């Protein structure tokens, strides 16, 4: 078995690399404790959901580097990276995580702005006369 498990998770434009080693349950995101990095409780819970569901929150130390996007995309990317690391460590966790849809890369991306329009779908105000 590998000493360090290295995985990647993506969501929107965010990319998270997770390095998982056996430890005491510390989670560090961009050199900050996860409580400081994700100040919003919901985003923190979303990021740590794979650990909570598999009941392995106290077994591993996880160091995460995350870049790009906003807070929501980053927490989704962190969640996917952690879920992939857990399955690499223990295949039995795969079934649990798959039923919770935590191993699925969310394909939704921001739709591009089109020319002749205000945003991707919103049009400029139309005047009949």
UniProtKB/Swiss-Prot annotation:
Task: Name the domain of life this protein comes from.
Answer: Bacteria
Annotated signal peptide: none
> Per UniProt, which keywords does this protein have?
Ribonucleoprotein, Ribosomal protein
GO BP field: translation
The terms describing its cellular component in GO are: cytoplasm; small ribosomal subunit
InterPro entries given for it? Ribosomal_Su5_D2-typ_SF, Ribosomal_uS9, Ribosomal_uS9_bac/plastid, Ribosomal_uS9_CS, Ribsml_uS5_D2-typ_fold_subgr
Record's NCBIfam families? PRK00132.1 (NF001099)
Q: Which family does it belong to?
A: Belongs to the universal ribosomal protein uS9 family.
Identification of the protein by name: Small ribosomal subunit protein uS9
- What organism, scientifically named, is this protein from? Pelodictyon phaeoclathratiforme (strain DSM 5477 / BU-1)
Q: What is the lineage of its organism?
A: Bacteria, Pseudomonadati, Chlorobiota, Chlorobiia, Chlorobiales
Q: State the encoding gene.
A: rpsI
